[in-house]
């Protein structure tokens, strides 16, 4: 009987040990599990909100980049020819001077006029227009560069007396100012 008692006692110990193991392996209570899941969900919600915010910022940055590239592309198309035009303007000036200093009408002078007209027409197609500077126009430092001053009783002070060199605009932006002489009041 001792053996039975001993075996029974051993069996109880094993049962107690297995119960302990079961207690250790038992899942958390439902309330604890819910709390744990809510915390995990809240953390994932914050992470999701941060990722969404990051996505929106990146998308806005990309859109701004696209707009900037498009604007730069338009600027290049609009003003990219500025360097070439600046090289052509002195030749244009020389053609105008040749016509102004011609002593007589000849086929050569007429050819120069025709060449000048064609060149001006071609430049106009690319957005180049002359700065209007008729005599008597008020001096505007945005479009004119004063090369000198002349005392004049006939003209209002600060008006254009003469144009040395025409100014030009490229798509309404100043390419080269007109070089002019400006009237001042005569000394008393």
Curated annotation (Swiss-Prot):
<comment type="subunit">
    <text>Homodimer.</text>
</comment>
<dbReference type="GO" id="GO:0051082">
    <property type="term" value="F:unfolded protein binding"/>
</dbReference>
<feature type="region of interest" description="Disordered">
    <location>
        <begin position="1"/>
        <end position="29"/>
    </location>
</feature>
<dbReference type="GO" id="GO:0051087">
    <property type="term" value="F:protein-folding chaperone binding"/>
</dbReference>
<dbReference type="InterPro" id="IPR000740">
    <property type="entry name" value="GrpE"/>
</dbReference>
<keyword id="KW-0963">Cytoplasm</keyword>
<dbReference type="GO" id="GO:0005829">
    <property type="term" value="C:cytosol"/>
</dbReference>
<dbReference type="GO" id="GO:0006457">
    <property type="term" value="P:protein folding"/>
</dbReference>
<dbReference type="InterPro" id="IPR013805">
    <property type="entry name" value="GrpE_coiled_coil"/>
</dbReference>
<comment type="function">
    <text>Participates actively in the response to hyperosmotic and heat shock by preventing the aggregation of stress-denatured proteins, in association with DnaK and GrpE. It is the nucleotide exchange factor for DnaK and may function as a thermosensor. Unfolded proteins bind initially to DnaJ; upon interaction with the DnaJ-bound protein, DnaK hydrolyzes its bound ATP, resulting in the formation of a stable complex. GrpE releases ADP from DnaK; ATP binding to DnaK triggers the release of the substrate protein, thus completing the reaction cycle.</text>
</comment>
<protein>
    <recommendedName>
        <fullName>Protein GrpE</fullName>
    </recommendedName>
</protein>
<keyword id="KW-0143">Chaperone</keyword>
<dbReference type="GO" id="GO:0000774">
    <property type="term" value="F:adenyl-nucleotide exchange factor activity"/>
</dbReference>
<dbReference type="InterPro" id="IPR009012">
    <property type="entry name" value="GrpE_head"/>
</dbReference>
<feature type="compositionally biased region" description="Basic and acidic residues">
    <location>
        <begin position="1"/>
        <end position="23"/>
    </location>
</feature>
<comment type="similarity">
    <text>Belongs to the GrpE family.</text>
</comment>
<keyword id="KW-0346">Stress response</keyword>
<dbReference type="Pfam" id="PF01025">
    <property type="entry name" value="GrpE"/>
</dbReference>
<dbReference type="GO" id="GO:0042803">
    <property type="term" value="F:protein homodimerization activity"/>
</dbReference>
């Amino acid at each position: 009987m001792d053996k039975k008692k001993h075996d029974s006692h051993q069996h109880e110990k094993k049962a107690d040990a297995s119960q302990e193991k079961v207690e250790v392996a038992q899942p958390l209570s439902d309330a604890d599990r819910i709390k744990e899941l809510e915390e995990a969900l809240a953390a994932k919600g914050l992470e999701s909100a941060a990722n969404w915010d990051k996505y929106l910022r990146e998308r806005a940055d990309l859109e701004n980049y696209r707009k900037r590239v498009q604007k730069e592309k338009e600027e290049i198309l609009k003003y990219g020819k500025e360097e070439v035009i600046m090289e052509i303007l002195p030749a244009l000036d020389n053609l105008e001077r040749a016509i102004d200093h011609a002593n007589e009408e000849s086929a050569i002078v007429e050819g120069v006029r025709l060449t000048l007209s064609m060149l001006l027409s071609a430049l106009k197609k690319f957005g180049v227009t002359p700065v209007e500077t008729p005599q008597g126009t008020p001096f505007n430092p945005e479009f004119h560069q004063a090369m000198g001053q002349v005392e004049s009783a006939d003209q209002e002070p600060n008006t254009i007396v003469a144009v040395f060199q025409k100014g030009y605009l490229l798509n309404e932006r100043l390419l080269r100012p007109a070089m002019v002489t400006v009237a001042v009041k005569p000394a008393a």
